[in-house]
């Protein structure tokens, strides 16, 4: 008998709703939570529930066959991966009853959550430097700062590789990979690169892990570490079992099929994979001693319908115990994460972005999108301490950008409300409240609409002691953008912008 591989994860998140019959509410609470947390009907408008989401759910519960017309691709691979049940998980009557609860409680429309007047259009203390050379059109998937080497990495869909830039955004090298780089971790002379394979959602396994080794003469040697993987999203290199050999943690985001795993280095360019989470949607991972026991843990943010933050507590010998720090409804759209001690208590805290809004061609703004700060309370517990609304929040970095002794947050939005608040494509949340009171003021730079910022990183690229920011623009997506803005991006938008910090 087919069973949902994510059974038991669900929790109710939709309280206080009065429309619909008790039987409809019970049907939704009974059936939906076998695979994910109970969705909140208010997170999507009624047309999206009716025309987009519920028809797809009929397929996912086995009441309708998957078709390309319904938005499914690589159907044979999905069936082989058991993405669909062999038998219906519920009757049509039960589905229709549960569906009525979502439709009855959904709003007719959703409003933007950002107030345009609250964003200060002046980024004090930063100079804006655009990369003079550009990929035409800009399709940047990787923006990474190597502070130790004073280098910037720029990956692009069309280039199928990455460029190495100097601190002034001068192009020094180019590495063609034959694949799309989306994440890179530097380990000595090695650039560990995660390649997604397909930028848009597919099941065809074309993901790769490459180790690019810099030779003394400036050339690169390439080692194909792993291939034939679902779509990758992040890679982090560390010694995870204490044997002195480099391992790496890998986010295999996939689409319907994916996983999170760590790869054990065996020497002689060999690695063994250990799967820690057999679910798609792993977005970001951070190796960190989160529980302060002196052993390295893995903090993993998972999107898709799981929408959870997991802590894998390490034993320093390669063993990991999974803890769920939180789980949100499947419409949450987790997209970015950083780890830093915000309140100065010695415990690493987590700042998270949720704003992925590419599920449907006409995805409306979502009232729950934004940036959230979770304080580490020990005992595998986190507490939400602050929420900053931000349409389409995507990538972020926590640093003391103004060097006043507390942490600020830089964040991009890949899905801003272009009609009401187009400048929220990049926001700097400057902390004016210190380490005990969260008072973040929003600002952006005047040229913030010059690109659609998918990629971001922060680090001291010029070696002057303060934190700079790089933004990478990807201008082609099937979601709605004003035609004038899109034309501007295509013709003259930069591939990358450096926000050079002048705090020192």
Predicted feature locations:
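Accessible peptide chain termini
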Residues: 1-3, 216
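Boundary at the C-terminal end of the N-terminal hydrophobic targeting segment
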Residues: 3, 10-14
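Secreted/luminal cysteine- and crosslink-motif detector
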Residues: 3-5, 36
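Beta-propeller-forming repeat regions
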Residues: 17-21, 25, 31-504
């Amino acid at each position: 008998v087919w069973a949902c591989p994510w059974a038991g994860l669900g929790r109710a998140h939709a309280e206080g709703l009065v429309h619909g019959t008790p039987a409809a509410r019970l049907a939704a609470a009974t059936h939906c939570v076998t695979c994910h947390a109970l969705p909140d009907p208010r997170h999507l408008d009624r047309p999206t529930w009716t025309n987009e989401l519920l028809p797809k759910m009929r397929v996912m519960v086995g009441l309708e066959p998957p078709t390309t017309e319904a938005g499914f691709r690589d159907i044979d691979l999905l069936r082989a991966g058991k993405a669909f049940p062999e038998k219906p998980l519920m009757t049509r009557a039960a589905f229709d009853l549960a569906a009525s609860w979502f439709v009855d409680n959904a709003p007719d429309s959703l409003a933007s959550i950002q107030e345009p007047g609250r964003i200060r259009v002046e980024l004090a203390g930063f100079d804006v430097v655009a990369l003079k050379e550009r990929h035409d059109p800009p399709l940047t998937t990787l923006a990474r700062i190597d502070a130790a080497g004073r280098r910037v990495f720029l990956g692009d869909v069309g280039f199928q590789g990455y460029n190495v830039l100097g601190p002034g955004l001068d192009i020094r090298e180019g590495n063609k990979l034959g694949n799309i780089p989306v994440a890179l971790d530097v380990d000595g002379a090695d650039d560990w690169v995660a390649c997604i394979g397909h930028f848009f959602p597919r099941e065809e396994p074309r993901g790769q892990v490459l180790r690019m080794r810099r030779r003394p003469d400036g050339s690169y040697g390439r080692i194909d570490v792993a291939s034939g993987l679902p779509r990758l999203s992040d890679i982090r290199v560390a010694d995870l079992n204490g044997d002195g050999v480099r391992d790496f943690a890998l986010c295999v985001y996939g689409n319907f099929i994916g996983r999170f795993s760590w790869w054990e280095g065996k020497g002689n360019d060999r690695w063994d994979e250990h799967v820690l989470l057999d679910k798609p949607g792993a977005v970001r991972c951070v190796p960190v001693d989160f529980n302060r026991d002196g052993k390295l843990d893995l903090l993993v943010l998972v999107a898709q319908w799981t929408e959870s933050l997991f802590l894998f507590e390490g034993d320093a010998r390669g063993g990991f115990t999974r803890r769920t720090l939180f789980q949100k409804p499947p419409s949450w759209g987790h997209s970015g994460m950083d780890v830093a001690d915000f309140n100065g208590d010695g415990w690493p805290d987590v700042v998270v972005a949720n704003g992925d809004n590419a599920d449907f061609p006409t995805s409306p703004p979502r009232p729950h999108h934004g940036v959230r700060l979770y304080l580490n309370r020990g005992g595998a517990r986190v507490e939400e301490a602050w929420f900053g609304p931000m349409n389409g929040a995507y990538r972020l970095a926590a640093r003391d950008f103004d060097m006043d002794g507390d942490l600020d947050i830089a964040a991009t939005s890949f899905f801003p409300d272009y009609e009401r608040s187009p400048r929220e494509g990049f926001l700097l949340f400057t902390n004016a409240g210190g380490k005990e009171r969260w008072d973040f003021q929003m600002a952006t730079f005047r040229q913030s609409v010059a690109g659609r910022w998918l990629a971001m990183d922060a680090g001291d690229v010029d070696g002057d002691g303060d934190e700079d920011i790089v933004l990478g623009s990807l201008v082609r997506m099937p979601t709605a953008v004003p035609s004038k803005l899109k034309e501007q991006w295509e013709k003259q938008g930069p591939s990358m912008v450096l926000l050079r910090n002048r705090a020192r």
